[in-house]
Swiss-Prot record:
Biased composition (Low complexity): 25-88
Signal peptide: 1-17
PROSITE patterns: PROKAR_LIPOPROTEIN (PS51257)
Covalent lipidation (S-diacylglycerol cysteine), chain numbering: C18
Record-annotated membrane-spanning stretches: none
Protein name in the entry: Outer membrane protein H.8
Organism from which the protein derives: Neisseria gonorrhoeae (strain ATCC 700825 / FA 1090)
Record region (13 X 5 AA tandem repeats of [AS]-[AT]-E-A-[PAS]): 23-87
Lineage: Bacteria, Pseudomonadati, Pseudomonadota, Betaproteobacteria, Neisseriales
Topology of this chain in the membrane: Lipid-anchor
Annotated keywords: Cell outer membrane, Lipoprotein, Membrane, Palmitate, Repeat, Signal
Amino acid sequence: MKKSLFAAALLSLALAACGGEKAAEAPAAEASSTEAPAAEAPAAEAPAAEAAAAEAPAAEAPAAEAPAAEAAATEAPAAEAPAAEAAK
């Protein structure tokens, strides 16, 4: 259940980011007016789900890079210490 809530949140963020909220409402309105487009509604949702899945790794990438940047920051003073001793 947590995964579905997380996926729904990502989907809503993706739709809000690309302005697709208005586009997502149009197929829903068509589906309610006739019975045939109801079969098309899941197909229309698939690209949005793929977009959310594509954005998930991009959102995780900065978090993965942050520890590497922190590690470089902590290693820099240690690397400077031998250089300072060599200069003496």
